[in-house]
Regions:
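C-terminal segment of N-terminal export signals and the immediately downstream linker at the start
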Residues: 11, 32-74, 212
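N-terminal export leaders
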Residues: 13-34
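Short linear motifs in exposed loops
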Residues: 75-77, 119
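Short, structural beta-strand-to-alpha-helix junction motif
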Residues: 79-85, 110, 122
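Immediate flanking context of iron-sulfur cluster ligation sites
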Residues: 84-103, 137-160, 175-194
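Iron-sulfur (Fe-S) cluster-binding segments and ferredoxin-like electron-carrier domains
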Residues: 106-136, 163-183, 198-212
Length: 212
């Protein structure tokens, strides 16, 4: 007598296969979102941390930044950009974070008199160097001539890019530049104004150039 073929092991149905694999996948997803303990997270990469004061944190290094004429002794994560250090640690928020890719110029500061995109520069790179932000350029009672010219020529609209525009314009005064507007536009091309105040910006810069 032959064995009944139906009495042997049976293959799972399509419904059973989908049910089993679906449960396994769900378990994997849930495991992936499980909370991570502070001990295990400490060894993983996280957001850059900076501190002007506080305990000695592993991986944090000391740096002295001379900002607007004052030496600031800081402890920073080596990954911290100059922009984040200025804004988050020193609370100098006049330097703006725009694109954070070095394409808009809103984060422009001066380092030893030259213009630098602070979002592309690590704070650690500028140990001991002289850094100037918009806060160190002038005061409400004694504006820098470029700041006064921007006001006089209405060279801004929303104002978000203005600090970077002014910092670039001041540094540009020390750079080789032709006398015409086209030359000014070329040297200022790294600073974007989404509001389109370019004619007024150029007029303000030319006013200062002719006055000095």
């Amino acid at each position: 007598m032959q064995d009944d073929p139906r009495s042997g092991p049976t293959k799972p149905t399509r419904r059973e296969f989908l049910r089993n694999t679906g449960g396994t996948a769900a378990a994997a997803v849930i495991a992936g979102y499980a909370p991570v303990s502070s001990d295990s997270a400490a060894g993983q990469g996280g957001p850059p941390t900076t501190s002007a004061e506080g305990p000695n944190i592993e991986g944090v290094v000391s740096v002295t930044l001379r900002v607007n004429g004052k030496d600031r002794q800081l402890r920073v994560d080596p990954r911290t950009t100059l922009l984040d250090c200025l804004r988050e640690t020193l609370s100098l928020t006049g330097t703006k974070k725009g694109c954070d890719h070095g394409q808009c110029g809103a984060c422009t500061v001066h380092v030893d008199g030259r213009r630098v995109l602070s979002c592309l520069s690590l704070a650690l790179m500028h140990d001991g160097e002289d850094i100037t932000t918009i806060e160190g350029l002038g005061t409400p009672a004694a504006l820098h001539p470029m700041q006064a010219a921007f006001l006089a020529h209405d060279a801004y609209q929303c104002g978000y890019c203005t600090c970077g525009q002014i910092m670039s314009a001041v540094a540009m005064l020390k750079e080789p530049c032709g006398p015409d507007d086209a030359a000014v536009k070329e040297l200022m091309s790294g600073n974007i104004c989404r509001c389109g105040a370019y004619p007024n910006i150029v007029a303000a810069i030319q006013h200062v150039r002719k006055s000095t």
